[in-house]
C-alpha cells in the first residue's frame, strides 16, 4: 500500500482560520479536535468535542455537543513580545497516514530577530482519550528569553453558551494538572488531565484563576539552542456516577501518568501503526488522472474515520462529525444513507453499532409517534444521545414578514423513518447477520412499518401519504412525495418479508401490511421518463437559477424570496427523485434515471 497523502494549508490568513480548523481537524471517533493554532486570534474558534456528550444550556435552548475546555492554546512570549502570525514563512500540513498535524514557522519580532517555532500534535488512534502535543522554539540569531503558558482553558463556550461548571482543579507535583468539570444539569462529568514536560534548564510555576489552569515555563536560550515542550492530555467522561469523583479522577490521572512514561515519538508510533492497519484495509488507490483525486479520496476516508464513534453504540455520527458546532452536533438521516454504507463494506461491526444506536432510541421514536397520533416509531429529525427530538423550533427570518420561520422538518420530513429501515435491510442483505435481524433489526423494521401504515390517509379507494417533506427541503408540506411514498412502500414490503421469514406471530400486522401495499398510491413515471416529485411540483413555475448558482455563499435565493415563495416554484435544495433512483435503483430503468437527472 502506498502512503496516504497530506493536506497542506497554502498560506496563513486570518480570513480562513476556521475553514482550515475544520478541514484539518483531528480525532478518533471518541473525541474531535479542531485544528486551531496554538496562539490566539480574534476570529479563531477553538473546539474540542466528545462523541455523545450533549447538554442543554437553558430554557429555550436545545441539546448540543459540548465545546470542552481548550488544551491546545499556548501563549508564547519571546523577549516580552507575544508570538502572533502575519506573513511569516510557514508550512502547515495534516498527514493522513498518521493523523499528525505539523506546523513550522520562521517568525521575526519587531526588532528583526528571527525564531523557528515548530509544533506538532495528534489525537491517538491507539488510546482514544489521549492527545499529544509538542512545540519547539529556537532563536536563530540572538539569545532569547522565552515564556510558554499552557494548560486547561475552561473559558471556552458554544458561541457564548456555557455548559460546564468547574468542579475541581488541582496540580500534582511538577508536571501534572487536572480539571474536573460537570455539565450544569449535573448529569455528566469530564476529567481533563495534562502533563507538561520541558527539556533543558527551565523555571516553572502554576496559576489557577478565571477558569484557566496554566503552567508557565520560562527558559533562557542562546542562539541556535532549542527548548522543547511536550504536552500529553487524557480526557475521560462519564454519565453514570458509579465511582466517587475523587476516585474516578485519580484513575484518569493514572492513565495519563502511564502514557507519560513514553515519549511523544513512541506514542505517535503506536498511533501511526493503528492508522496503518486501518488504511491497509480501506484505502482506495487511483491510478492516473489528477493527483487531487487521490487526495480527495484520502481526505474523505480520513474524516469518515475520525467522525465515527465506533467505540460506543449509544452515539452516532453527527452531521459535521466532531469538527465543530454546526447543526449542534446532531444526528440526521445522512448517517444511515451516506455514511453507513462505507462502514458496511469495510467493517460491518461499525455499521451494526450505528443501527443499534437507533434501536436503543426506539422508545423515544415510539413516544414521538404516539404524541402525534400515529403508531409505530417516528424517529426524530435531529437526535442527540437520548433519542428525543432535538430540532430547533425556529430558523431564518422571513424577508417578507420579518418574523422567524418555524423549522418544518421535525413535523413533516418523515422519510428518515424509511431511510433507517433501508439501512437495516442493506446490513441484513450484505452480512446475513441473523442474530441482528431477528432481534434489533426486526424491531426496527416492524415499528417503522407500523408508522407508515398509520401515517397513510384514505382517499376514496386508495391510500396516500399527505403533508410531507421529501429530501428537497425547498418543497414543504406536499402530498404524495415520490421519494417518501416509494421508500415507505419499500419499508413495509421488506418488514413484511422479514416478518414472514422469521415467523412473526403478529397476524394483525401482516394483514395491515398486505392491505397497505395493495392500496398505497404511487406516482407514475411519465412518457418522457420523468417521475413527478409530488402531486404539485410539475405545475409550479420555473425561474432562472443561474444567478444563485454562481453566487458565493449558501441559500442566497432566500435573500430575494421567502421560504413560502420558494415553496411554490420548481426549485430544489437537495436531490429528491434523483435520490430515490440512487436508493432503489432496481425499481427504475437507466433511461428513467437519466431523464430525472437531466
Please place each PLM-identified region on the residue numbering.
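Acidic/histidine-rich catalytic neighborhood
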Residues: 401, 447, 451-508, 512-515
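Alpha-helical scaffold segments in carbohydrate-active enzymes
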Residues: 299-306, 357-364, 443-455, 490, ...
